[in-house]
Every structure is written in C-alpha cells, then in structure tokens.
Amino acid sequence: MATLFTPLQAGDITFVWTAEGGLYLAVVLDLYSRTVIGWAMGTRLTEDLAERALTMALTNRTSATGLLHHSDRGSQYAATRYQRLLGEHGIITSMSRTGNGWDNACVESFFGTLKRELVYHRHYVTREDAKQDIFEYIKVFYNRQRRHSTLGYDFPAEYEARTAMA
C-alpha cells in the first residue's frame, strides 16, 4: 500500500461510447500527483460503480485523518453507502456547488485528456475492447509515462518517487 501524498482526492464519472452500447468510467484522482488511484467501469451509472472506484483508491492509498474527497453532487456520491464508506475511513466529504463543473476541474481535465488522447481516436466494437484500452491507458501510460505541466513535466509515478525522497 502506497503512502498518502495528499490530503485531497477527487472523483467523477464519464461516458464512453462503443458499438455495443455505453460504458461508464468512474475514477478517483490524487490531486497532489494527478495519479488515478481508483477506477471502475460498468454498463450502468450506479452507486456501485463509484463505490468500486473508491474501494480501489482506498486499497491503493493509505488514508489519513483529514483526507478530503471531492465529487459532484451526483446521486452515486450522495448515496448513503458511499458516504458511509468515506466516513468509515475518516474521510471528509466535499461536493461541488450545484451546476458548477469548474469545482471538479481536475477530474474533468483528466477525462478530457483521456478522450482527446485515446477514446476519440478509436472505434470500440465492444465494451470489453474499451475497458482493456482504458485500463492500459490509465495503468501503463497516464500514471507512469504521461508528463504533466502541473508536475513540472514529470509523470505521476516519477513525481511521487521524487517528492517522497525530498
């Protein structure tokens, strides 16, 4: 389990089209390193989808007192089970103002990057094709190879390693 680098993380959900039908992607982003620390994909926009992404994030990162988890006001994030899971880990909830996408700009930016660099250049026949491609993009490219201006043009894994030693 990795060390917690930031007291801030954010979650959101986006939609990817395939010839087989839609695929939803829920992510949790570490706002310090821009690492995607949790994600889940599914055919339905449900509380369980967001909860699976959060569970992965909690598995990948230790939580600390005062950790702030930001999301929009979607029913998946306001759901009792989701809020209970945050509370059980001592995580403070923050939610965007109604109708204000700017409040979750970091995750929206990630989704824009994912779609510009990957999704818009593909024609997914099946949801499984999209899932595999998105998994590889996040795990192999985005977290380990993609450079970020916010991080001084480091990639997330490099930035975390360098700042952990400082």
Give the residues covered by each predicted segment.
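Charged DNA-binding/catalytic regions of mobile-element recombinases
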Residues: 1-166
